Structure formats: C-alpha cells, structure tokens
Regions:
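Intrinsic-disorder-associated interaction segments
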Residues: 1, 16, 20-23, 27-30, ...
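Short, hydrophobic, well-ordered secondary-structure elements
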Residues: 52-78
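Charged alpha-helical initiation segments
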Residues: 1-56
Length: 200
C-alpha cells in the first residue's frame, strides 16, 4: 500500500526486545496489519458506517499488541520482580481443621467453619489488564503518561462485542484508533530503552 512506512520486516524489528521469535513476528505482523488496514481505509474514501469495520479492526490489533507486550514482559522478563509477585497474590480465606472433629459451632442455623486469612496466588488470566499496566508503570517499562490511553484502547477492544456495544450504546471512533497508533511508538521506545538500561 502506498505510503505505508516500512515493509513487514520493519514492523517486526520494532519488537526487537522480544526474544521469542514467533511472538516477535506475530506482534510485527499485527502492527503491519493495523497500518495496512488504515491505509486501505484512506484509499477507499469510506466514511460513516463503512468506516466502522476498519476502525474496529485497528483497535483490536493495537489492544492485542499492548496486551501481548505487557503480559510477556511482566511474566517472562520480570517474573521475579517484587511488583509482579504482589500482582500475582491476593488475600483469601483457607479452611483449616482448628477444632476437634466432634466439635461443631453454629450461628443460628448455619455451621461456622474455621479458616486462616493468607496470601494466595492469583491466576494470570484473572488479573485485570488495568492492574497489569499499573504494575508495568511501577516497574518502569511503560510510561505513566500513556498508561491511561493504553488501558482505554484495551477497554474499547473488550467493548467491541456487538451485544455490549448495543447495551452501552458505544461507537468506536477513528480518533480512538489514531490515539492507539500514536501511543504505540513511544510505548515501544520506552520498553526498548528501559530493558537496555536495566540489562533485562
């Protein structure tokens, strides 16, 4: 497509800090695809409802890129960082047999169970993306200046389900996909610089 900066390999190279070659390629291809679709949208002079699928696709691509990079860096590069350990733990009640087997306590008609309140591991897919971005900001590989826009792009992707769109009367706009694009290069530069300076 005319005026698309760089070929596919250029886009892949923007993720040079990702050591996994398959993930790096797929991230680059997603970036290239988002840019390609934007240029295609421009070339076809679409507007109104005809523009909607182009914008929706771009938001989905950029949100997926942000998510994949943040998750990969948190759990592959910084899995031993104190912030990541905190992110993956929560307090939970764990039942224990503190009383003799024949002893039973009740509150009205309900049986009372003894428990301890201790740290428990939170499954990665149960951690909200907003919390992952905040953790990345505290570690330093995501700039606080762009964190809210990254979270918003991800929220828009999740709100792109037709039923949710209808219930909340939401429309994705071209400006939202442009913001997702404009934030990506500084996001990648911040990650690259931080990893280089910290030997990660």
């Amino acid at each position: 497509v005319r005026d698309l900066p760089g070929e596919l390999q250029w886009h892949v190279d923007q993720f040079s800090f990702i050591e996994n070659p398959e993930l790096r390629f797929r991230l680059g291809r997603a970036y290239y695809s988002a840019r390609y679709v934007y240029k295609l949208m421009e070339a076809t002079f679409v507007s109104g409802d005809e523009r909607h699928p182009f914008v929706k696709f771009q938001i989905m691509q950029y949100a997926s890129i942000y998510e994949a990079v943040v998750v990969h860096l948190l759990f592959e590069k910084f899995q031993n960082h104190a912030e990541v350990a905190d992110l993956q733990s929560h307090k939970a009640y764990k039942p224990i047999a503190a009383l003799a087997g024949v002893t039973e306590m009740r509150y009205g008609d309900e049986k009372i169970h003894t428990c301890v309140y201790r740290d428990a591991k939170t499954p990665r897919n149960s951690i909200p993306f907003r919390d992952k971005v905040d953790c990345a900001v505290r570690i330093g590989f995501v700039s606080e200046a762009y964190a809210e826009d990254i979270k918003r792009t991800y929220e828009l992707r999740n709100l792109a389900h037709i039923e949710t769109e209808a219930a909340k009367q939401l429309e994705v706009e071209i400006e939202q996909s442009k913001t997702a694009y404009w934030r990506l290069q500084p996001f990648l530069e911040q990650a690259t610089t931080f990893l280089s300076e910290n030997g990660a």
